[in-house]
């Protein structure tokens, strides 16, 4: 399903984010950038240990990434140029609004890097425990608010692993984003 927001194409799709062609892939990360399981583990397995090594170096230099913020590394063997590590909230621990903040910061970082396309997973829905619909609301809100200000980013892919995630996100995005078409 495709949407258009402020001249930016937003594509909701099922799939494996490590296989997507985009200038940047967003990783659902923890503050210490230790990429063990879920999307983070898959990104390191597919992209190579260099992503984990660069992440540890980033934390050594800058300290842990605050919830709602991002860090950037190379993408190793992935098709992307960069991995933008976005730290979303743990539901029930940190405010859900930090998820929208993380998405906005990921989009703005990609814009700062002059990128054209970015792929986002369902941040905070894995071990961080946020329900798909709540995460989708935060992500749709962030995209709707930031997209009109983007100049280099022309395409945002929201890549969902599994049918349940896709259906929940589709339901929410249809409500919050204009111009949905198959």
Swiss-Prot record:
Entry-linked SUPFAM superfamilies: Macro domain-like
Record-linked InterPro entries: Macro_dom (IPR002589), Macro_dom-like (IPR043472)
One of the Pfam families matching this protein, by short name: Macro
Boundaries of every Macro domain copy: 1-177
SMART domains referenced in this protein's UniProt entry, alphabetically: A1pp
Name of the protein described by the UniProt record: Uncharacterized protein PAE1111
Organism of origin: Pyrobaculum aerophilum (strain ATCC 51768 / DSM 7523 / JCM 9630 / CIP 104966 / NBRC 100827 / IM2)
Lineage summary: Archaea, Thermoproteota, Thermoprotei, Thermoproteales, Thermoproteaceae
């Amino acid at each position: 399903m495709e949407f258009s927001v402020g001249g930016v194409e937003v594509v909701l799709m099922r799939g494996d984010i490590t296989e997507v062609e985009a200038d940047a892939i967003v990783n659902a990360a923890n503050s210490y950038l230790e990429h063990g399981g879920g999307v983070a583990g898959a990104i390191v397995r597919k992209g190579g240990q260099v992503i984990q090594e660069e992440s540890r170096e980033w934390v050594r230099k800058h300290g842990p990434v605050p919830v709602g913020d991002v860090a950037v590394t190379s993408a190793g063997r992935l098709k992307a140029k960069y991995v933008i590590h976005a730290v979303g909230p743990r539901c029930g621990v940190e405010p859900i609004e930090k998820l929208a903040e993380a998405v906005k910061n990921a989009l703005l970082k990609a814009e700062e890097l002059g990128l054209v396309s970015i792929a986002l997973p369902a941040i905070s829905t894995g071990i961080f425990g946020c329900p798909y619909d709540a995460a989708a609301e935060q992500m749709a809100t962030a995209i709707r608010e930031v997209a009109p200000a983007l100049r280099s980013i022309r395409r945002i892919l929201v890549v969902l692993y599994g049918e349940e995630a896709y259906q929940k996100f589709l339901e929410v995005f249809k409500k919050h984003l204009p111009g949905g078409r198959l």
